[in-house]
From Swiss-Prot:
<dbReference type="InterPro" id="IPR024909">
    <property type="entry name" value="Cys-tRNA/MSH_ligase"/>
</dbReference>
<dbReference type="InterPro" id="IPR015803">
    <property type="entry name" value="Cys-tRNA-ligase"/>
</dbReference>
<feature type="short sequence motif" description="'KMSKS' region">
    <location>
        <begin position="264"/>
        <end position="268"/>
    </location>
</feature>
<keyword id="KW-0648">Protein biosynthesis</keyword>
<dbReference type="Pfam" id="PF09190">
    <property type="entry name" value="DALR_2"/>
</dbReference>
<dbReference type="GO" id="GO:0005524">
    <property type="term" value="F:ATP binding"/>
</dbReference>
<dbReference type="GO" id="GO:0005829">
    <property type="term" value="C:cytosol"/>
</dbReference>
<keyword id="KW-0862">Zinc</keyword>
<keyword id="KW-0067">ATP-binding</keyword>
<dbReference type="InterPro" id="IPR015273">
    <property type="entry name" value="Cys-tRNA-synt_Ia_DALR"/>
</dbReference>
<feature type="binding site">
    <location>
        <position position="207"/>
    </location>
    <ligand>
        <name>Zn(2+)</name>
    </ligand>
</feature>
<feature type="binding site">
    <location>
        <position position="236"/>
    </location>
    <ligand>
        <name>Zn(2+)</name>
    </ligand>
</feature>
<dbReference type="InterPro" id="IPR014729">
    <property type="entry name" value="Rossmann-like_a/b/a_fold"/>
</dbReference>
<dbReference type="GO" id="GO:0004817">
    <property type="term" value="F:cysteine-tRNA ligase activity"/>
</dbReference>
<comment type="subunit">
    <text>Monomer.</text>
</comment>
<keyword id="KW-0547">Nucleotide-binding</keyword>
<feature type="short sequence motif" description="'HIGH' region">
    <location>
        <begin position="29"/>
        <end position="39"/>
    </location>
</feature>
Amino acid sequence: MRITNTLTGKKEEFVPIQPGVVRMYVCGPTVYDLIHVGNARPAVVFDVFRRYLEYRGYRVIMVQNFTDIDDKIINKANQLGVDYKTVADTFIAEYWRDAHALGIRPANFHPRTTDFVDDIVEIIERLVEKGVAYQTETGVYFDVRKFEKYGELSKKKIEDLIAGARVEVDETKKFPLDFSLWKKAKPGEPCWKSPWGEGRPGWHIECTVMSVKILGESFDIHAGGEDLVFPHHENEKAQAEALTGKVFARYWMHNGMVRFLGDKMSKSTGNIFTVREAVKRYGRDGLRYMILSKHYRSPMDFSEELLQDYSRAVKRVWEILGRYEKSGDIGIPKRNAVYEEYVNRFVEALDDDFNTPVAVSLIFELARNLSKAMDDNDREDALLYYHLIRREFGPVLGLFDLNEEKKEVSSEELLKLLIEVRDVLRKEKRYDLSDRIRDHLREIGIILKDTPSGTEYTVE
């Protein structure tokens, strides 16, 4: 398997640190509004990448965070006249509703920034002790000139970054590119205690701390949109490597941006099309097909007309599948030479820098073959093509997936709620009730594992 590593700019063979296990961190949303198609792209891309790694036999430990304290969240709370927690909790719940509708499987861990403030303070203290961070009257900053490899990920020199980048304007900083680790609280803002006074974490330190605490000081893959390469991922890398002296993430994967009406789709400009509206009008598979039909590193143009075209193409495949399912002949085909050839083509495509356009095209080729086999009354070939779509490739791509249909009986939001309720019960030492929740979930195939970083679960 070869993937393009942003760090080196090259397509490299993927070799995990621990054989058979992949640890990956995907930057998640700042929760102050509904997610849009631009947010959906990394969610779908890395959902499928995780599925494919599992298909290839890897055990994947995936983390996707929620930034639940941020200027945008505070501003939204002020607009609505509510507490910042209300905004964060509301839009995390809305995220799960949209993610479930889009067929996004939950990561193993979904940490919130506010659950890691003590860890963040501890890490900042260590950075200050190492001399790579300093305190000012407005907070604590990372001194980028103390980290020799700053700019390595974005492939830019410090002087070029100063000229072209968006940086925090603060006259108390030693250097324009120095970035905030801890922001001193303004009147009325939510805040936490620290050695530098009451305040809250900076954006970049959040992801560094959550990834290191859950996945370890070095892990395999760090992923997100290409707009995060600088400053967010560059700063994450600088903090982590200055702290530990180790390589932070071995492979960096970044998806291209979604363009809508000629510009990048963005909440800040109001140039958006929500996932909820897209799925409501054109269906889950239509949107997933649209996203996967473009190579993940390429920019993606979005329009409602294009989405409608993808939705129509998906509908035709569903009609072919429905026609076959009426025959009732849904068994297990023989893995003959034709079957193996398709599997090899599928693996070859996704092993080559995760080429989903080729992988998705195989499903449509199989659908055409299935239709012809039914016309020719070739039951053996028809079963083979049907099985490849519904049980072999569909579950990997999250398209036409028979397994997903069965799972929709259980609600992801309900599972998350049960886990949160159980955590509260455990903190209150009401172990009789918390154990009952754990045992009942085990009976339906959901296995809980309590770790220092939170509750992890797997579905058997």
